[in-house]
Amino acid sequence: MAVWEGKKYKMEKSEGFDDYMKALGVGMVLRKLGNSISPTVELVKNGDEYTFNTLSPSRTRRSSSSWAMEFDEETVDGRMVKSVCTFDGNKLIHEQKGEKRPRSCASSLPPI
């Protein structure tokens, strides 16, 4: 069993997120909302497919793909991006490419 299976992960801190969203042209209201949310993330394996769930009080986002394969994802501000998720030890690497600039997010994952 992989180290992440059967666990959920809660975001504890986010650095530079407001500046990043501002650079993407996200408005002030959505930036304030995004900065106020600490989502819980879970990755569920079903056969060869993985579902990446991001759970927050305002909405739940689900994206499914084969592991380390590109998939379509809708961001909080409604943009469609191409994403790839991989693990490096206990870090989840979530890369997004869209009409603006690419984004890579590394998250340390101590389970809750």
UniProtKB/Swiss-Prot annotation:
Which keywords does the record carry?
Lipid-binding, Transport
The record's GO molecular-function terms, alphabetically, read: fatty acid binding
Q: Mind telling me which Gene3D superfamilies this protein's record contains?
A: 2.40.128.20
Q: Name one GO cellular component term.
A: nucleus
Q: Name one GO biological process term.
A: fatty acid transport
Q: Name one Pfam family in it.
A: Lipocalin
Family membership noted in the UniProt record: Belongs to the calycin superfamily. Fatty-acid binding protein (FABP) family.
- Protein name as it appears in the record: Probable fatty acid-binding protein
Organism for this UniProt entry: Anopheles gambiae
